């Protein structure tokens, strides 16, 4: 592609004579950068469309017509001719295992077709490491493998017998360890299932390597733990974060809510910030653990850091709040439900209603954790998939918020897959009265793991999965995300899935979730821009292209509002700017 950046040096007299409608316009202070001749989707309150933008000192100083933009061009102004391309606010991922996934082998590649491909990927990764070093990966899904079965320890032993291996499933709620990892973690035939977890076993009772829910923590204890530093050198962690930031920029993405953070990972972020290497804004959600004491430790640590919307680096790094879990996943049928899970769409997983995270005794502890964090003035995000889990979450929020009078903490329901009518009404109440109760939903679930989801939720529940239309009609805002590495992080997939609601493999038809809960691209884009910015406490700085806001901008090859919705998935980002600086440019 020909470069579309060029610098214009124009005579001042020419500029003064080029006002709109042929009328002379007073010269404005020259901008650092002007974008012209495009379709600029602003996502402002009127969803206005403009032709041009002017930027100075990283902030937008003008949005409007081409002729008026020329007033901002001076001798040193850089001008970008968009040549009819489309500019939007930079896209935002409101729920992503950003830094954690950066440290892992990605097995969510569509080119991985079978278990042999997984073995080859693991072997190639392990061959780069010293013997004995952990291999950690994520993103595999048996539903996308030709064998349509779990990977086992025996499979992984072929790939890396001299390395402990743990591969997290794409849902993040189970994984598989090889024999060395099981040995190092002390998992044997005699090891009991932990509360809230299951060790998968063969007919003789031996562990197969598959560890579900809390059972996976037995392995994670040996491999570094979700959200931890994973024993990797600090420089390796920094390099991996920079690499995923660049990947985000290539997809027109400029901000992320990074979940399951701990002090070690936050210190890596601070180092990168000090080195002025950030190209993605990061709101961090800190792992709250499963006890009163664990949440108290996080509260104490966060007291030492700026409280959102205050930040480090002018909105680049925020010490956001606390992440809690109340249940499991839809992929593993461990989400906490009122009725039994389905299997294979029309079958029933008899007696399996899932269970609370951390065991049956945890829900009252969770409620106390929410109360403590709310009293401390901290934002809380709770993983809640099943309908019973979502009810428990919103009721816990309401109880804590009404008791404390807290306002503006923006407590969120992460995933919020199948909310009941009660949950939806409570979300609306909390949003209206307390600025809290916001779903942070992953539309790509319906695509990337949609075939598994459809089979597990069953025909009736499928139709109320991620009910975006209902939320919109109730006046409920939500923020979009990927849950990477559960699904690929490119937000264009989320835009497409929010509108289309189609599955990856059409195992139960292309649209088992129906289309009654679809919304249009205008709404979908809000969920990945201004509504997501709200959940990062940054809506006054980013999320729309308006005068005074940071110039976080994505430039696309096609007009998002005019192309058929089926083409949203294939959008190509041509340029990304963060705070007015080019972070990515297509060649």
State each model region's role.
Residues 1-4:
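Positively charged n-region of N-terminal signal peptides that target proteins for export
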Residues 26-36, 41, 45-303, 318-320, ...:
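Divalent metal-binding segments
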Residues 155, 267-272, 392, 396, ...:
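A short acidic, amphipathic alpha-helical/loop segment
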Residues 272-276, 306-314, 402-406, 427-436:
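Acidic (Asp/Glu)-rich catalytic clusters
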Residues 279-323, 410-428, 450-478:
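Phosphate/diphosphate-binding loops
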Residues 371-381, 388-411, 416, 421, ...:
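His/Asp/Glu-enriched, well-ordered alpha-helical/loop segment
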């Amino acid at each position: 592609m020909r470069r579309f950046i060029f610098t214009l040096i124009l005579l001042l007299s020419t500029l003064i004579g080029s006002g709109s409608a042929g009328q002379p316009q007073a010269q404005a202070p020259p901008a650092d950068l002007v974008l012209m001749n495009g379709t600029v989707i602003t996502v402002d309150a009127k969803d206005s469309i403009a032709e041009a933008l002017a930027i100075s000192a990283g902030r937008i100083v003008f949005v409007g017509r081409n002729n008026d933009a020329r007033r901002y061009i001076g001798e040193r102004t850089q001008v970008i001719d968009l040549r009819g391309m489309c500019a939007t606010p930079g896209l935002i991922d409101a729920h992503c295992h950003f830094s954690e996934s950066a440290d892992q082998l990605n097995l969510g590649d569509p080119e991985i077709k079978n278990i042999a491909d997984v073995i080859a990927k693991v072997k190639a990764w392990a061959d780069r490491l010293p013997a004995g070093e952990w291999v950690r990966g994520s993103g595999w899904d048996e539903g996308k493998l030709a064998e349509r079965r779990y990977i086992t320890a025996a499979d992984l032993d072929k790939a890396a017998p001299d390395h402990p291996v743990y591969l997290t499933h794409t849902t993040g709620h189970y994984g598989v360890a090889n024999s060395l990892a099981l040995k190092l973690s002390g998992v044997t035939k005699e090891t009991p299932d932990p509360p809230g977890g299951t060790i998968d076993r063969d007919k003789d009772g031996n562990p197969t390597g598959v560890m579900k829910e809390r059972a996976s923590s037995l392995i994670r204890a040996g491999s570094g733990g979700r959200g931890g530093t994973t024993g990797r050198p600090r420089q390796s962690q920094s390099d991996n974060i920079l690499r995923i930031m660049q990947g985000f920029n290539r997809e027109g993405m400029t901000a992320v809510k990074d979940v399951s953070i701990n002090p070690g990972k936050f210190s890596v972020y601070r180092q990168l910030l000090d080195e002025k290497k950030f190209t993605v804004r990061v709101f961090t959600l800190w792992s709250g653990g499963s006890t009163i004491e664990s949440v108290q430790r996080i509260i104490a640590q966060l007291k030492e850091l700026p409280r959102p919307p205050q930040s480090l680096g002018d909105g680049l790094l925020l010490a956001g709040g606390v992440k809690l879990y109340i249940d499991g996943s839809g992929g593993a049928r461990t989400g906490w439900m009122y009725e039994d899970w389905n299997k294979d769409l029309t079958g029933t997983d008899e007696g399996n209603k899932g269970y609370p995270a951390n065991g049956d005794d945890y829900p009252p502890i969770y409620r106390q954790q929410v109360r403590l964090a709310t009293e401390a003035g901290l934002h809380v995000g709770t993983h809640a998939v099943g309908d019973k889990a979502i009810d428990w979450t919103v009721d816990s929020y309401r109880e804590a918020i009404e008791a404390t009078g807290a306002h503006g903490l923006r407590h969120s329901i992460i995933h919020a897959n199948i909310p009941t009518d009660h949950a939806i009404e409570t979300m609306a109440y909390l949003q209206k009265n307390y600025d809290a109760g916001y779903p942070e939903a992953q539309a790509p679930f319906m695509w990337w793991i949609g075939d598994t989801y459809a089979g597990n939720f069953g025909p009736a529940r499928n139709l109320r999965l991620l009910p975006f239309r209902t939320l919109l009609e109730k006046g409920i805002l939500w923020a979009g995300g990927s849950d990477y590495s559960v699904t690929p992080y490119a937000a264009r997939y989320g835009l497409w899935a929010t509108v289309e609601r189609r599955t990856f493999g059409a195992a139960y038809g292309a649209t088992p979730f129906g289309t009654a809960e679809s919304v249009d691209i205008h709404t979908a884009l809000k969920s990945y821009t201004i509504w997501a910015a709200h959940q990062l406490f940054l809506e006054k700085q980013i999320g729309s292209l308006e005068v005074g806001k940071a110039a976080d901008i994505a430039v696309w090859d096609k007009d998002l509002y005019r192309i058929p919705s089926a083409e949203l998935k294939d959008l190509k980002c041509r340029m990304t700017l963060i705070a007015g600086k080019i972070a990515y440019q297509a060649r």
